[in-house]
Amino acid sequence: MSLTRVSVTAVRNLHPVTLSPSPRINILYGDNGSGKTSVLEAIHLLGLARSFRSARLQPVIQYEEAACTVFGQVMLANGIASNLGISRERQGEFTIRIDGQNARSAAQLAETLPLQLINPDSFRLLEGAPKIRRQFLDWGVFHVEPRFLPVWQRLQKALRQRNSWLRHGKLDPASQAAWDRELSLASDEIDAYRRSYIQALKPVFEETLAELVSLDDLTLSYYRGWDKDRDLLEVLASSLLRDQQMGHTQAGPQRADLRIRLAGHNAAEILSRGQQKLVVCALRIAQGHLINRAKRGQCVYLVDDLPSELDEQHRMALCRLLEDLGCQVFITCVDPQLLKDGWRTDTPVSMFHVEHGKVSQTTTIGSEA
C-alpha cells in the first residue's frame, strides 16, 4: 500500500500543500528548520492521530489556527483506494474519517496506514524504558495477528480493575478472583502472540542486520513479565501483599521486555551511535518484511535525516534495504546528493524541496516497478 495523495493544512510552519508522492522513494530536502520533518509529522498524524515530536497538541497546530487537518488517499494492497482524514483541534478534540465515515478509534487509521518511523529519537528503542520496546513489539503483533487487539483490550480492562482494587480495596474476594483469572487468561494469550512474533522476527532481523553491520554477538531475547516456570495466577497470589503496598500489579505482560544485548551486555551501553541507528533500522525493516509475509499490506516508512550518524557505505546499504522492501518511503535530508546514488535506475524516486514551509516537487526519476 502507498499514499497517492497527501494534503496538509495548518501543521506547524507548513504552507497548505497537496503532494502526489512516488509509490516508492520520496526525498524531502532543504535547510534545517525549513519544514521537512513537519511533512513527516503530518503523515504520522494521518496514520496514528498523534505527533512523534510533541506529546502536546498545541505546538503542532499553526499559530492562530483553531485546528490542523491532514487528508490522504491510500492505495490498498487489493488495489482499492481508501480516503483518510484527520482534524485535530487545540482543545484536544479530533475527528477521524475513513472513506466518508467517522472512525471509532485511531486503531482503524493504524490498520489502514501502517507507519514505521526512524528518527533521532529511535535510539530510545535501545536506550529507553521497557515500555518503548513493548510498544515496538505490540505494534508488530497488531499488524500480523488480527486476534491480538481484542485480547490486548481485555488485558487492559482486567489490569485496570485489579489495580483499582489494589489501591481502594472495594472488590469482594469472589470478584477479585474472577478478575485475576481474566488477567491470567488474557496474559497467557498475549504472551503466546508475542512469543510467536519474536520467533518470526529474530531470523529476519539477523539477516537484515548482517546486510548493514557485522555484530555477530548481538542477540534478541524476550522476557514475558513474570517467571517463565510459574503460572501467573500463582505469581499474583504470592505477590498480593506487595502489590497492595505498591498500588499496582507487579507481574504480567505489562512488565515484558525485548532485551537487546551484545556479548551479554546491554547493547546501548556498548554500540556507537551509528551502530545503534543501524540496529534500530534493522529491527524496523524486519517488521516491514513480516507484514509483507502476512499479506496484510505494506508499511510506509518515515525516515528523518537518514544520512546522520552514517558514512557513505552504510547510507547506501540502508537505502538498498529500504528499496528492497518494495514499499513507500519518505526520507528527509539537508543535502540530496548524499542519497542520489542509493537507488536503482528503475525505482521511481520523487524529490521535494522544502523552504520556509513551502514544499515543491523538483524531480521525478525512474519508473514504476
Swiss-Prot record:
One of its GO terms (biological process) is DNA replication. Its main location: cytoplasm. One of its GO terms (molecular function) is ATP binding. SUPFAM superfamilies: P-loop containing nucleoside triphosphate hydrolases. Disulfide bonds: none annotated. The RecF protein is involved in DNA metabolism; it is required for DNA replication and normal SOS inducibility. RecF binds preferentially to single-stranded, linear DNA. It also seems to bind ATP. InterPro entries: DNA-binding_RecF, DNA-binding_RecF_CS, P-loop_NTPase, RecF/RecN/SMC_N, RecF_2. It holds the Pfam family SMC_N. Keywords: ATP-binding, Cytoplasm, DNA damage, DNA repair, DNA replication, DNA-binding, Nucleotide-binding, SOS response. It comes from the Bacteria. The keyword ATP-binding applies. Belongs to the RecF family. This is DNA replication and repair protein RecF. It comes from Pseudomonas aeruginosa (strain ATCC 15692 / DSM 22644 / CIP 104116 / JCM 14847 / LMG 12228 / 1C / PRS 101 / PAO1). ATP binds at residues 30-37. The keyword DNA-binding applies.
